[in-house]
Design a protein with these regions (language model features):
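Acidic (Asp/Glu-rich) sequence patches and key acidic residues
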Residues: 1-150
Length: 150
């Protein structure tokens, strides 16, 4: 099992010295809507969840909707799932927290290596590489919408 993260944003094109937004007409409704494109995709094993938790970035990576002021803590799985689908998280909402966590991880590698998966599927070096790459994308596309699939 793994975590898949995706950043999406409005498609833009350069033409005649200007930047244009791309729109498309929905086949079913006939309504015009902004065309969204995938800006970044990443994947990491769930075996690194404990390492992320220790660094204080589990929710930022796996469940960013929980960081929203609109999120209501609940024991009702269906209601939480509904909230996840209804709360929009932007890259800029989570990038500072992820940077802070990455700094913690890089400051004490030996501590975080204690969370390496015994089977080798999920090691410190994999986690650092994933977080660095993801953070770079988050900072490059601060207005991108973040989605996570667990």
């Amino acid at each position: 099992m793994s975590l898949d993260v995706t950043l999406t944003g409005q498609k833009k094109i350069e033409w005649n010295g200007k930047t244009w937004s791309v729109w498309r007409k929905d086949d079913e409704s006939g309504e015009w809507e902004e065309y969204q494109e995938v800006l970044y995709e990443g994947n990491i094993t769930h075996n690194l969840g404990d390492m992320a938790e220790e660094a204080g970035i589990y929710n930022a990576l796996w469940r960013p909707y929980k960081l929203s002021p609109h999120f209501v803590e609940t024991d009702d799985y269906d209601y939480e799932y509904e909230q996840e689908g209804n709360i929009t998280v932007l890259a800029s909402d989570i990038s500072p927290l992820i940077r802070e966590g990455l700094n913690k991880i890089n400051a004490d590698p030996e501590h975080y290596k204690k969370f390496d998966s015994p089977n080798g599927w999920g090691l410190y070096k994999h986690f650092v590489s994933f977080v660095e790459e993801y953070l770079e994308a988050l900072e490059k596309y601060p207005n991108a919408v973040v989605t996570c699939d667990r």
